[in-house]
Structure formats: structure tokens, C-alpha cells
């Protein structure tokens, strides 16, 4: 799941932990109430077969799959202008990397799969994402399972 707080937030938002997993009761058979909780702006299930029915989200790429969202950063660098202001995140199990617009219109999320372009940009055929980093200039780094660090680069 991806949670979002406005920049003027005072903090202390309640995203439902440990009663919810995304927008769903946890454990599933519990009778949970969501009053006072802030729902995530995006989620996908561990079982990718259900992503197409996920709460009516409009996605550019309906083939999202994975097991665990690996959080990233809002891109503030200058090397890839098309990503400026977008939240970059990935999946721990598949190595896929997406970006999502983060603005006031969280009802109409624009989700873009950058995986193939990133693989070309870092010169690899596959990549397994374990973490992200960001430098003082807003450029983003990708860390793989083996500890190698790559500059975020996109080649079309």
C-alpha cells in the first residue's frame, strides 16, 4: 500500500495499522471498523490475479503484480524531467518499478510502469529491488539484493 499525507500535515495520521492491511481488514475474518483511519491512495494484492478488480482504480498498466511495495521517493532531480514530482516505488519480489502522480487528484492516479526502460538505462536484463536512495540533488538510486547501487536512468 502507499499512504499519502499533505505537506502541511501536522503528522500523527492513523493509517489503520494493525487493524488494516491496505484497505482490507486484517485478519480478513475480523469485523473491523475504519472510522478515523486514512485509506491508502494505492494498493495491490499479494496475489496479482486480483489487481484488475481493485476498487476501480484507473491504471495505465493493468498488469501490476508483486508481493510487497518497496517505498521510494518523490523525484526532485533534473536528469529525468518527465518524472519530476512523481513518487517512484517498486516491488520487492519482481523488481518492477513504477511511478505515480502525487497531487490533489488522488482519485485519478496515473501509474506508469518504468521497469523495461530502467533495465535498459542500467544495462541489465533483470533487477531485484531491495531499496531506494536519494542524493542532495533529488536524484534517485536503486539498490538490488546483492547491494549494488544504480543511478535511476531511463532509456526508451
Where are these regions (language model features)?
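Beta-propeller domain segments
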Residues: 1-112
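Conserved blade-ending motifs and adjacent loop-strand segments that build the rim/top face
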Residues: 69-70, 106-136
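Blade-level signature of beta-propeller repeat domains, shared across WD40, Kelch, NHL, RCC1
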Residues: 130-156
